[in-house]
Amino acid sequence: MSALVYFSSSSENTHRFMQRLGLPATRIPLNERERIRVDEPYILVVPSYGGGGMAGAVPRQVIRFLNDEHNRARIRGVIASGNRNFGDAWGCAGDVIAQKCGVPWLYRFELMGTQRDIDNVRKGVNEFWQQLPRSA
């Protein structure tokens, strides 16, 4: 299985989801001055921001991470979290990233996710990597 990369704000909702998921993952730092470089294909797990609009939906730290061509070249899919209170914009960071990076939007979950979300993501990630060659 290939990598998961995620961002979680100080609310830690996405971090708690990733802990429960129990798969190896790298966290994009909260501090924008800290940078990471990912050297293998990965799926990005990202929360949506902005109170329901597309503007500001993708966290700044994630934008900075993806603006590094090395990192952007290795993204293979995106999973988004959000709040259903945002209506149609629920999980919209996933849509924005999928469109801009030309990768599939694989799944979305609310806040910390449910056990069903954990099970679906675990299964979906495994199936995704089996269908996609690691070198792709």
Swiss-Prot record:
Protein name: Protein NrdI
InterPro entries: Flavoprotein-like_sf, RNR_Ib_NrdI_bac, RNR_NrdI
Source species of the chain: Salmonella newport (strain SL254)
PANTHER family: PROTEIN NRDI (PTHR37297:SF1)
Gene that this polypeptide is encoded by: nrdI
Family designation: Belongs to the NrdI family.
GO terms for MF: FMN binding
Superkingdom, taxonomy of origin: Bacteria
SUPFAM superfamilies according to UniProt: Flavoproteins
Task of the protein: Probably involved in ribonucleotide reductase function.
Gene3D superfamilies associated with the record: 3.40.50.360
GO biological process, one term: protein modification process
